[in-house]
Amino acid sequence: MLKKTRFLDPGRVFLAVGFSLCLFSNTVWAQQQGYPNPTTPQPLASGENVQGGVLTPPSLLDLVSSRISEYSRTDLAHGLYFETLDGKPLLETNPDAAYNPASVTKIMTTLAVLERYSPNYRYTTRLSYTGSFDRERQTLVGDLVIESNYDPTLNYDSLFYIAEKLNEAGISTVEGNILVSSGLILNLRKSGVAAGNEILTTLDKARWTKASESAWKYYLQAKAAAKMKIDSTEFRGVTFVSGKVLADDVSQPRKRLMEYHSAPILKVIKVMNAYSNNDMAHLLGRLVGGPSGVQDFMIRRVKLAPGEIRLESTSGLGSNAITPRGTVKLMRYAHNWCEKNRIAMTDLMPIGGVDNGTLADRFKRSDLVGSVVAKTGTLSNVSALAGVMFTKARGPVFFAILERGYPGSMRRLQEEIISLVAADSGGGLGIAYGSEMGMSLVEDARVYILREETSRA
């Protein structure tokens, strides 16, 4: 429950000469804190206390409770828990009540995936072909086969990169069809044959759409920003004579052509969390058994009690539940895991006011920018923020703010709470002022040519 403040008669506080020294010291304190000059009688501000006739600063809880009361009639809609690195509780309101964490769930998925797979794990998309390769005509006489395993990074940039490598391998024409596996996902939306059709209209310039043209321009910009080699600003691509897309029934023998390895999964995770991409979270969740696999990880590894968590999705959509204290356990676990693996928390989550995405325009005040590393969560009547804030006096402070209410208002309240905690902790300590996120994940992808030589005379 919120701490209620008793309003006292101002005459007891500002009596006159006998308390002049006390008045002077508190006047200085009030001015430093931005309170009105108390030289004339006025009611105490919410949270102020009188002890032995001396006006004392309000506690952190008093200040936060006062701000919450400005937004809600009850504190039951607000779950807060802040804890220092040495485990000391700093601030709490309903820490053991269950709230919907929304997209903060993605951090649960993040850690479950990273524990099972190396941070350097890459998705692999394999290209092979049926028939033969006519070197003189730079032509595959047969079908191009594309097999993938639900890679969330495959997009236009990936296809342009693959097309460039096909050209380098001496392939400019395919006389057969495109055969695709069921695990092929493109641009996070289309799968199977639908994805194959978009591959066809991207690799073959004669079939380009306006979307293809725009994507090519963006690809060139991303390569330039990443200082990747640009051999030509003109797209050559691959001509498909037949141009049909079929589901691969794996009935025909095929020869290896090349492999496309995605960016390391750690890079994928940072993008997912920065932009809070639900489709990425669903696909990453497949790697660990979906919601039940992530929930099992939270109970088995993070040591949450079964009653502290309930998951229906790996993205945060739907009716998930966790306590603020349980969320801070997750953040502490993430911190310890990162230290053990020599990875920074900023490799997992965006930096407030620095990285693109959901935190790009938050915590941009000079005393907070670069000091908050966190994950946002938003649903129609849910707003959440959890992560770690770096402070000058207390070092890292783990926190969870899980709230029910209009997200726009709750976001403002969250920033006020973070500001109050930072001020109480000597101020925020910026750890990064420039983003290391690139324009495209393709800059960290790799292509390996593996062609088995079967040439026609």
Stretches found by the model and what they are:
Residues F14-S25:
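Bacterial N-terminal signal peptides
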Residues Q31-D86, L90-A98, A163-A169:
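Beta-lactamase-like hydrolase cores
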Residues A45-L55, E92-P101, L144-L154, R254-E259, ...:
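Second-shell loop/turn segments in exported
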Residues G87, P101-P119, I178, M272, ...:
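Active-site SXXK
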Residues L90-E92, G285-A457:
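Small-residue-rich helix-loop
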Residues E115-T130, R342-T346:
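Short, well-structured active-site flanking segments
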Residues Y123-N187, S191-G196:
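Active-site-adjacent, His/Asp/Glu-enriched structural segments that form or flank metal-binding
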Residues A195-L348:
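A small/polar active-site loop signature that marks catalytic segments
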